[in-house]
Amino acid sequence: MRTANIFTQITQINTTNDVVSFRNTTGKRVIISFTLKTQYRQFSNVTNNIRPQVLNLKEKGIENRKKLVNSQSLSFFKTTAQAIESQLNSGNLLASSQSIEEIKNISLPVDLNKNVIRFKKRKLLTAYLKQLQIKKLNAVKFTFKLKNRLLNRKTVVVSYTPKVNNTNKVNFLQQLLTFKQKVAKHYAITKISNKNQTMFLNTHGIFRNQKVFKRSKLKMLHQQKVSIKLLQKVLRFQKQRYSILKPHNKFDSILTALMADCNPKKRMKKNSLPIDINHRTEISQQQKDSDLEGLLTKYKVKTQELITKITKKQRRLKYYLILTQLRVQKDLSKGNEVEKKQEIQKKNEQKQQKSIQTQFIKKVLTGVLQKNEQQQETQKALIIKILLNILRRKGEVTGEGNMDITYPYLKEVKKKQRQLQMAYVAANIKMKLVNDFIDYKGDSRLWGIHVNLIKSRNQYLNIIETQFENEENVYQNPIYKTKLVPLRSEVEYLKKTRYMKYGVNSRNKITILNNVMESDKKLYNLRLPKQRVQVPTLLTIYKNVRECLSGTRAQGKKEEDRAIYQFVMKLEKLKRNRNRKQSKLRISKQQEIQPQKEESVKKEKVEQIPLRQGVLRITLKRRNMFLVCQNKSTKHVDTSLTARQEYYRIYNTKDFDAITQKGKKDLKATTVKPKGPIGRFISTEVFRRRVITQALLNLRAQIKYNVLDIEIRNPTSNPLIKTILYKNWYVYKNQGLLRMYKFTKNKAHGSMRQKKARRL
């Protein structure tokens, strides 16, 4: 029977906090702080698509393992998220008025190694951000988290959990399941070949054929299905563009329809979301005009009061500046006073000219308003007629006059029209901000977020007023050439008030879902760099071996230790020859007598390190295990061992002597003979490790071989094969190398057995 510990696997978690900075297309700097939570685990696969791992031949318990993990902590830039939040709240990083969005809890479906994070960390993130096409954000906080994964023979499941309130869980459960089904169908990657060393993912057929071994998981799946059925009943009655966002006014539903008509190119594609977009509200043009006019008339009374206040403030500033200039002039010397009087005279002359122009334009506008009711003509034609009549009275124009004379006057008229038009719109919106600020009903914790949103909107309104003073900025923006200037400004107001109207804590769920879809689609196609392995040098092996033998040193060990040391010192000389730092050898007497040869000199041969390669063949059976270690070059069998032999060696009390086995501390806990038959105990996972380690320690594989290959023969299918080696040996520095694994079978498939039977 299978034990309950089949699916347990040792994991190793590490966390890092880092910062990445880059520039947008506009040239603004973006600063991103993220936290990686890497979860290492060792698992094998039936095929040869397996990565190399480094073995540890020592078993000293969990305490020594913790020391090694802490000693191998990498040197990262460590910055907490609190330090960056303090900078964001102060406003040092924010350079524009765009709203900030937080993308949280994205899962990477790849098993990263420490060496990958060390060398390829920044390149990976910048490439990942470019694929998501994140260009317009100014300060973003990312938190990447690798979640737990269910490991089966053929599939790997990726899980991601965005943070949601209790009220919004029901909407998310539908979105997640519908999204996962699409990814499993369209964006899954099958294994191309067994020969490739790279490892591909299989997500196809997970959700239908998902094996569940625990009752707790079955309950979770049952709750998800129930919540979806409740939603389907609700969504049948909702026929809106976005079934999640519930508009609270007529004005919101109108704008969604107008946005699609104004920007047909930016209309969302089909099947980009799991929600049906084709269900839209049809509104007539008469209804649109009537609704918009009614909304604008509400705020006319409120805006007139604001406009009068603004004009009074502007006048006060002018008087204040004039007084400050006079006070400064008295303090200055007489020479500077004369120069500044001339400058002030020029400015006053310019102001008089502008005042004459403004009075001239006011006459034009008053004439237009009077005649516009009488005559039904275009606004341009009326302005031109009135201009020509005024110019004839002054005598500047004779006869009928040409159109070209009126162009410089028309430009100034258009400026004032637009400035008045946009100031009226900005005052409308500022009144809305006051109402939203007062009527805020939310958590006290989120008050800071609410204030930052209002600041960003006020910045946008200040831009509207200053943007139309220059003519060039007007004609560059083709949006404002249209007649929908007041409408489009309110559309952008709604984009930024959407968080606050629907609740600040409940984010816009469609933007989150689009970001998740684009990210997960491209992670399946993203190829990470290959996993690097540090091959150990012989000096490092010598030091590790010397530490092992220092405590238990006996006869013969000292000579072996010295032989290794002499061999290592030869290799150090060879390295010096390559760098040409070794002192020249003395010339012998025979070489001095011989005549020197020509320039053709023989190059000295360089001694190469011998590659000592070994194989460890394992045959696993249900109640026994065989081990053979062989040298590939000489094909000499060094050791051969079975599991039954060790069982009798350890648990046979007659042969056990405390004097001879004094140093072997591992055997004291296992001297008690276990209950039950022998074969059942040999098939356990703990005993199989002991057989492999004791064979390698008797062989001294660290010294004897540079490289060691493993072949596992598995005539009877056993689920423990895949976890024996990976639980036993972790990735440590410079303690030997396991280069490759092979899983072979003696028996053929059913079709091949029939062919062999025919031949015989």
Swiss-Prot record:
Native source organism of the sequence: Dictyostelium citrinum
Gene Ontology CC annotation, any one: mitochondrion
Region of interest (Disordered), residue spans: 578-604
Bias (Basic residues): 578-587
Main subcellular location: mitochondrion
Keyword Mitochondrion: yes
Highest taxon above the source species: Eukaryota
Subcellular location: Mitochondrion
Assigned keywords, A-Z: Mitochondrion
Bias (Basic and acidic residues): 595-604
Name this protein carries in UniProt: Uncharacterized mitochondrial protein Mp36
